[in-house]
Structures are given as C-alpha cells and as structure tokens.
Amino acid sequence: LTSLLATYRPITGENAPGLRFECVIEDFLKGKKLWLPVEMLKEKKFCAIIKCGSISAFCEKYMADLDQEKARDAVFRYLIRLRCKHDFYFFAYAYARIKNKDGGDDIPFLLNHAQIGLTKDFERQRLHGELHSILIILLKCRQWGGSTDTEVYMFWIQMFWKTNWNSNIIGHQSSSATQVFDMYEKLANAIPTWLYYEIGETFKEDSRKLRTSSTQNNIKYLIPRSCKIQTGSARNPESCRSADAAMAHITEEAFFPNTTEWTPQKVVNAAISPINVTRPYTFIVRESTPNGRENEFHDEWVRANSFDKDGNRLSIYTPYFVPWFDIEKYILPFKSEQEKIDFVLWLYKNREDEQYHGSYFWWLWEIKGATLEGIHWYVNECKKYSDLDGMRQEYPSDDVEAFLFSGTTVFDPYKLKEMEEDCK
C-alpha cells in the first residue's frame, strides 16, 4: 500500500523515479535541496554552476562583462530548460496542464502510480534500450491516463530532444484521434516561447505555436521545433499515411473496422511503416481497451508476451497492462486495526471457498499481490454485481481476464493460455 500511494515532489525531485543526485543552488528554486537526474551532470556548464554554488556566483565568475541581471535570467532559463530536458516528471508538472476530471480549471500533470510505471518503461527504453527506441503495446481497461501520459511524453521528445521529428496519431474514429490532438494543442500553447529554443538561439516572441496545414486539415506543425503532427482515422485509412513519421500513437486499435479493402493490420502498417525503429527516439505505442480475442491487437499482445527458445521476445513491443489493484483510487481503508485483523482472518478462513469466491479473493492476495485495502474495496464493490464475472469484466486483474470478458468464449481462458504456451 505504501508503494501504491507513494508520491514524489516534482519540483524538488524528491522520491521521483530515476537515478538522481542531491544538490543545492542557493538562488535557484528558493535554494531548496534538489534531487536531479544524473544525466544532467554530463553538461559542463551545469557542473560549473553547481561548483560555484549559485547563479550569481557563476555569472560573476564567467559572465562578468555582461549585464548581471540579464546574465542571471539567461542562466536561470538554461537551468529550467536543462531540467525539463532530462526530467520528464518535472516538465510534466511545471508546464503540462490536463483536464480536471472533477471540473474546474486545468491542473498540473502529476503522474499517478500507473502512469509512473508506463513512463519508467518509456525511460528504460530511451536511456538503456539496445536501440534507444520506444516501442510499447498498451492494454488498458480502466481510465488511468495512459493516453495522456503517452501524448505528453511524445510532445516532450519533440520539445527537447528532436526537431523535424514528426508524429502520427491514429484512432478508430476521427473523433478519438482529434480528442488526443486537442490535448496536444492545449499543451503546446501553454508553454512559454523561450522554452522551445536552446539558450542563445534567437527567436520571435510569437504566441502561435501550432499552424494548420494549408492543404490538409489533419496536419498541424509545431512551428518552433519544425515538427509535424498528423491525425488519422481507421475509418479513413488514407489519412493514416505519413511518409516521414518518426513517432506513432495508435489508439483503440482493437476496435479498428475490418473491411474488404482495409484490414486493421493494413491501417497499422500504413501508420508505422515509415518509422525506422533502429533510430534512437523513434516511438510507437499501440494502445487499446480489449475487444475479445479475434483481432490483430490481441494477436500482437500474445506475441509481445511470448519468447523464442533463446529467450528473445517474438515482438518488438514491450507489453504494459495495469490491473485494477495498481490504481490507487481502488482501495477501501479499514476503520481500525481490529477490522483489518478480522478481514485477514476472514480471507484466510475462506481461501478455499468456491461458492462465495473466497478462493478468488485469496488468489488476489497470494498470487497477484493486491493490497488488503484493495481486496477490501474489491469485496465491497462486488456487491454491486449479480456475479463475480460482472466484476471481473469491469475490473480485470490480469490480461487474461481483460480479453476474456471483453469478448465471448466457452472455454476456461487460463487453460487456453496454458495450451497456447505448450504449443510454442
């Protein structure tokens, strides 16, 4: 439970993911102790600032012939941009604004537990992967912000790491791709112009960050970074073609229509075929809620979870799934320590009960690693449904349940999975 509810401090970097080091710069962010990504230490100028101990001392030593106020402002901006470039969690909170699901104004993007897990996969592949490309197949069942995290991360790559790095956003309907792009547009326009440019690079103070193509309404340009963002729909496959894409986000793939002219696989291929995944910072996320087992998305998910005799994954994609018990809002705290003890005793006593699902609740604890507070919530939530299957459909505990209850089958899905593995 502690891990599930753990929070990080995005401004100071305390408890934030990734390898970090402690430092203090007296006149930067109010002189607070900071935990910064170790990758920042590769910058000689940054190391010199740390050695001086403050922005003012650095300016006096290395920029004495310049107006000191302007020099300090330039160094401050340098530090902010460098921090944003190497610390996605800081950038997301400081500059990305997302819709407040409770209503009201947009809020800073503070990643939740599930989003942190996905971002760790992104960062692991970017920093330590063999090719430094980012390739994920994302199975989602509950709304935990996977698409939001994906889009902000794609924007971050275009913003700080790559110019002329074009992206393709494909949905099963034009509205789904447009919705994703609207969030992208909001993000781009909220960021100050100077942050788009390297320190010292000249630029015009123009509030326009995005421009729509004069020939195609589904294409927009991120002007300061010379990046193209194209949206497309599986119902209009030609809109998915992009000859120079380096990144793609394919959303709700399992619901792509299957026609005589265009299969879902052809639509996906049209979107990703231009992307050379051997180049660092290329990015593909194939994401969907499940829609049974008879579709290309399910087949690719199975391949991503399968390995050859040498232990190599059969797919280029790394699978990512979030069960309900890894989403922090699905817990029910106990009123007292005694109530918790009584619940544990009840759980153990009924661990072999099939009729009232005690064996399943015990499986969540012993095999799946769900928290007691999570199982407490699950048991209580089950009372809304006439049977356990209804609950498992809404809140799957693993990918097997996710695909089972999104389609129809007359066979035990776990037995089917065992048979599939035996056939490899």
What do these predicted ranges mean?
Residues 1-424:
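Phosphate/NTP-binding elements of NTP-utilizing enzymes
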